[in-house]
Amino acid sequence: MAALAAGLSKQRAAAEGLGSNQNAVKYLGQDFETLRKQCLNSGVLFKDPEFPACPSALGYRDLGPGSPQTQGIVWKRPTELCPNPQFIVGGATRTDIRQGDLGDCWLLAAIASLTLSEKLLYRVVPRDQSFQKNYAGIFHFQFWQYGEWVEVVIDDRLPTKNGQLLFLHSEEGNEFWSALLEKAYAKLNGSYEALTGGSTIEGFEDFTGGISEFYDLRKPPGNLYNIIRKALCAGSLLGCSIDVSSAAEAEATTRQKLVKGHAYSVTGVEEVDFHGRPEKLIRLRNPWGEVEWSGAWSDNAPEWNSIDPQKKEELDKRAEDGEFWMSFLDFLKQFSRLEICNLSLDSLSTEEVHKWNLVLFNGRWTRGSTAGGCQNYPGRVHRGSG
């Protein structure tokens, strides 16, 4: 009876707008505006009691209390790391994201794709934040969780070693939006270590509330290039990776400098005239910001000398650090899976516009019966009754 009443209460609140991006649910009951006002009035910087700067926030095993990896970690605010910290410098871009000592490349790939759309980015990363005006050591971010937007509040104490950020950081040493976003997502998931080894599509969904689909690149549909092109034009988020057969292969580098088990963002496609025939190209980004494809159509590859110089210059300008072009055929040979998070309810697989109908059911997983697994293992086993 209590569960029914709670469900009805939630439905009523949703009908009144609670859980929308404009009126997000307050995670753990923490209200950003109220807490910031209290800190400004008292003159004391915010310290988050729900996600304190202590070993438990780092992790539970490899980053757990007493782990050798956590020795020497000091939590510092950006104001202690540089003289003029900024939330965002010159607009958030995909080059703002550099991976640190945490295996969350999947999350970085999702964040990099998020920066391709300012509208999407500022839905997750509210603009009203600064280290100057109304600074109180408190920041907030929004994530999509179980059918509603949730606002997560954090303080700005970040884990460092030797005066440098330990995890996600920006190329600009005084820019902190990406490091703070990672901390908010870690809080939502329980710890930083909980972010290790996820799936890019999980990040896409949590940042957008979009509908995701998966393509096995060993058996791609014939129109996949057009699907990707249309998805990018529609503002969808795309990621890809190379499957590994064992843990020993994880993050091993191929002869042509691709990293196995590593998440890449898909950031563009282009068709060029190459020796009198059309050549389909695709642009990818490694969240590490380095270690790029060294095969055909890579930086300084001879293929670039056989296309129109103006086109070459145009494509050069579009590629940022850590980004590279490769032929679409090589992409299909080298990569194992493609994940697309659709923000529009239009179908991507045809030129015609089809609308989806969305029906939302709230329920729960039951351990040993209906509980699902990590999205890294999407296989389903139907368990019969009786």
What kind of feature is each model-predicted range?
Residues 1-386:
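Structured alpha-helical subdomains that flank or immediately precede key functional sites
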